[in-house]
Amino acid sequence: MKSIKLFYDKILNNIEKINPHLYRFLTYNLYKIYSEIANSIKYKDKYFFHSVSLEISTYCNRKCHYCPNKDYETPKNFMSWDIFKLAIAQLKDIKYTGIVQYHLFNEPLFDERLTDFVRYTSTHLPKAIQVLISNGDLLNIEKAKELSEAGINKFVVTVHDTNPERNLERLKPVKEFLKEKMRLQTSNELYLASRGGAADIEKEKRKTDFKKCPDIRTLIICYNGDIILCCQDYFKKYIMGNIMEKSILEIWNSYKDIREKLLRDNITELPICKICLKRE
């Protein structure tokens, strides 16, 4: 299954070179269809999470114009090894084979334990696809090789400068080394969301107005073990539970009705969702 996903990803990378818009469409829609079919069979739930984001730390070195970090100082908190291992163990219990990422609003490369985390995930979730989302400021060939060997399957690096040419040039050798494993983009290519109202992006050109939430099917595990509603909940107002008190599966199923209303019925009830999906 993992080899099929990676082969599919390789094809999409080639499509992106020809037509970036088609790439975005296929990335979202084809993977959505595939994951819904697979999860319906495996978990009897078409909306089961296909991606997990582990907030291994809260620190980011950037103050990007579209991110709430530019307006708020975030304390430097780090996920403990005990919580990390518990999260991986619970994912292993349900035979999880989806995507594992190491970010929320943080820059993963600033955590010196990242390679060890990746290696641990590779050992205990060998069929999962590990993705590094990064601003690339600390990424070089040596670090890319280290992380790739530890188990990172895909590097997605976004250059956040207003004039990104310099950093794009700096990262070219890394891209040449990683080849199809790395997706290099600028912040101009991102879809912008208001982070549930925490970021003011009205002055920016929003790339997409989503009819349905694209993020509610990602499981977010915060540094302290809290599971929050989605990756747009910057202030962590909607805490669904904590993995040290209940299992991931119990917590995920506890707000199934919210997901189904959003994804199946297109009904938006929570204030954060109304703001994010522009339905105020």
What does each model-found stretch correspond to?
Residues D111-R217:
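Conserved AdoMet/S-adenosylmethionine-binding subsite of the radical SAM
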Residues I221-N224:
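Short, acidic, Ser/Thr-enriched surface-loop or helix-capping motifs
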